Amino acid sequence: MEQFLKIGLIINTHGLKGELKVNPQTDNIDRFKKLKRVYIAGEEKQVEGCKFLNDKVVLKIQGIDGIEIANKYRNKYIEVKREDAVELPEGRYYVADIIGCKVLDEDGNYLGKVKEVIHTKNNDVYWVEGKKELLIPVLKTIVVKIDIENEEIIIKPVKTWLLE
């Protein structure tokens, strides 16, 4: 399991004092208000402030005091240690734990591994790479079981839900 979890991507600077504009990658952006420390490019950083700008988060990080310094962090991820992450309710999973899971159907056929989780308005979609690439909607009618410990996801047979 990943030791660090990505919670946002730094997309730009904000203002002249070194604030960072972050595209959140979490279900609940309010969690950013509680952050005391984060990791950027593997370095621990102290969070001095947080505000929201539409659907983005603006963070003030200790030691990043100007636009020139802030620019160096563009396109880097904001991460937290797993033990500092928000506890998820039952049936919810961190994207980092889903990526790399083997996907099999109920008949035991290996379909591939989850390469990416795509977030859509209605539901997530697993992008599975195997003999064929599959986009699997994360719906209770399709995804039967998610076993993070064994890195395995069981789905209904593709022919039952995908029209070819």
Swiss-Prot record:
Gene3D superfamilies: PRC-barrel domain, RimM
Localisation per UniProt entry: Cytoplasm
UniProt GO molecular function: ribosome binding
Residue span, PRC barrel domain: 90-161
Pfam families associated with the record: PRC (PF05239), RimM (PF01782)
ATP-binding listed as a keyword: no
Alphabetical keyword list: Chaperone, Cytoplasm, Ribosome biogenesis, rRNA processing
Keyword Transmembrane listed: no
GO biological process assignments: ribosomal small subunit biogenesis; rRNA processing
Main location, first listed in the record: cytoplasm
SUBUNIT field: Binds ribosomal protein uS19.
Role played: An accessory protein needed during the final step in the assembly of 30S ribosomal subunit, possibly for assembly of the head region. Essential for efficient processing of 16S rRNA. May be needed both before and after RbfA during the maturation of 16S rRNA. It has affinity for free ribosomal 30S subunits but not for 70S ribosomes.
Family from the record: Belongs to the RimM family.
Recorded domain comment: The PRC barrel domain binds ribosomal protein uS19.
Name used for this protein in its record: Ribosome maturation factor RimM
